[in-house]
Amino acid sequence: GIPEETPTIAINRQCSSGLEAINIAAQLIKTGEADIAVAGGTENMSQVPYLIDYKARFDGLRMGDSTLRDGLTEGLGCPVNRYHMGVTAENVAERFGVSREEQDELAYISHQRSSTAISEGRFTNQITTVDVPQRRSDPIQVHTDEGPRSDTTLEGLSGLRPVFKKDGTVTAGNASSINDGAAMVVMMS
């Protein structure tokens, strides 16, 4: 294992923290500050907690109410414009002229390619089986990426309604999905 004395850093944000960790590890190796680095990240979007006002940590909640905020909505919101990242996807599609059909086609191709790679066992040596405890039954073994849907069709995608703007182009089928997962790499000079 990795000795306890090994220096570490943690990046705590909703998305791309794993990629940032890999970039930092690469910089450490490139500058000679490290010969070997372990980098990675996790996403646990299905278990994001509800949040209370930050001041409650230090001041408590004395004789008053506090509003619970959905941590997932907070994480998927733009802190500058205060709207969901799905609206950002709509804005980007509009700005760069990406049609609904193009988005659906990319989603379809992505699902098909991923499903084919899974069925051919291309990820078998990259995914570690995880046992997920159940309340009243044996643990479920997760050993495959659950995001790709092999039954995705262009017809099915085209029938989905926009979810972020009334006349928008981003749907539950062509938007980024909400996932749980983790990845780790060992990097060396």
Over which residues does each language-model region extend?
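Active-site-proximal alpha-helical scaffold in enzymes
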Residues: 13-43, 93-122, 184-189
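Flexible glycine/proline-enriched surface loops and loop-helix/loop-strand junctions
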Residues: 72-74, 94, 167-172
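A short, structure-level motif marking secondary-structure boundaries and short turns
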Residues: 10-11, 73-75, 99
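Conserved catalytic cysteine-centered active-site region
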Residues: 1-37, 79-84, 151-177
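Short, well-ordered secondary-structure micro-motifs
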Residues: 21, 49-50, 140-144
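Proline- and acidic/polar-enriched loop/turn elements at helix boundaries
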Residues: 9, 41, 49, 105, ...
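Flexible glycine-/small-residue-enriched beta->alpha junction loops
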Residues: 36-92
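N-terminal extracellular/periplasmic Venus flytrap/periplasmic-binding protein-like
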Residues: 102-189
